[in-house]
């Protein structure tokens, strides 16, 4: 029997983990960069990836001086590149099996 641990963070914990203000998190949520469950900021719960995504978003916003819309697009494209690289590696492994035969 296996058990799954689901970690959810409230607004205060996310702000502490990502070292950002609540206003910053609200801005990030408004642009769809992170998507909490819950209707209001007081009720929001974030998954365990939210601190990492939030930190990346803030870094892009500050260091590259991107608007939040640009940050959302950049993060989406970076995720797509990572997914394509993973898929490419998997296909290379499969191809390698056929070539070795």
Curated annotation (Swiss-Prot):
Transmembrane segments: none annotated. Pfam families: MerR_2 (PF13591). Interacts with CbpA and inhibits both the DnaJ-like co-chaperone activity and the DNA binding activity of CbpA. Together with CbpA, modulates the activity of the DnaK chaperone system. Does not inhibit the co-chaperone activity of DnaJ. Belongs to the CbpM family. HAMAP family: CbpM (MF_01155). This is Chaperone modulatory protein CbpM. It comes from Pseudomonas putida (strain ATCC 700007 / DSM 6899 / JCM 31910 / BCRC 17059 / LMG 24140 / F1).
């Amino acid at each position: 029997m296996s058990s799954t641990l689901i970690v959810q963070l409230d607004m205060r914990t996310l702000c502490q983990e990502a070292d950002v203000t609540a206003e910053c998190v609200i801005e990030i949520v408004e642009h769809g960069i992170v998507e909490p469950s819950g209707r209001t900021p007081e009720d929001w719960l974030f998954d365990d990836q939210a601190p990492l995504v939030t930190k990346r978003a803030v870094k892009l916003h500050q260091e590259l001086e991107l608007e939040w819309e640009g940050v959302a697009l950049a993060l989406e494209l970076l995720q797509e590149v990572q997914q394509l690289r993973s898929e490419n590696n998997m296909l290379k492994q499969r191809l390698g099996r056929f070539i070795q035969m």
